[in-house]
Amino acid sequence: MAAYYNEIDPYAAQWLRNLISAGHIAAGDVDERSIEDVRPDDLRGYTQCHFFAGIGVWSFALRMAGWDDSRPVWTGSCPCQPFSIAAVAHERAGFDDSRHLFPTWFDLIRECRPVVCFGEQVGSRDGLTWLDSVFDHLESESYACAAAITSAAGAGADHIRNRLYFVANSMRTGRQRHQPIERVSLAAQAPFAESRNAAARLRALMAGDYSGLLSGDEPSIAVERCRARGYGNAINARQAAIFIECADEAMTHH
């Protein structure tokens, strides 16, 4: 069964096609249209749908967490710019920002009724305000919701990057209030520990120092910098996978 990837950036969309061809993420189709142009009928026949797909890390993380490609799920990493610290320079338009696209995604959720949805947002006070609105919308359609703020450092990364992950499950009947937000430590997750070598490489990459990471001439280094651009907007796969595992266990046993 095919997966659907919606990604408006042509560069990231080509990454998706390459990763699909290489078998690193679920096989499927890449749609470069704006989510605002996607209609429910366009999603018929797809088992998994990934919106704001980036370079497909949600699909990779699902596999890492043991979630089979044939198992239905939707994911979405809605643009964080309206609610991030960086938005200060633009006076934080928030819900009035044209990049606040959850309402558009929600329209598709309401029409298509996926069983499970995963998403994430910046782990800040503004992110929590955003989440309140998201859960109000989802609960109005009888989704049970839960969320946690996790740190990439707890999943082995060499940076903090707190992110707000959430899950919505339509299998329960009746409207139910969402679970309290928790800060979850992932440090105990031994399978996802990073080596010191990997941490050192990541430190250098984040500092913009490619000299110790790359071999070759300047053109080859330029290519690697383009690759880093794709990574820059991606979620942390291990961080997401641990949340998926925990959410799946909760949905299975409760």
Predicted feature residues:
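Conserved active-site and SAM-binding loop architecture
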Residues: 1-254
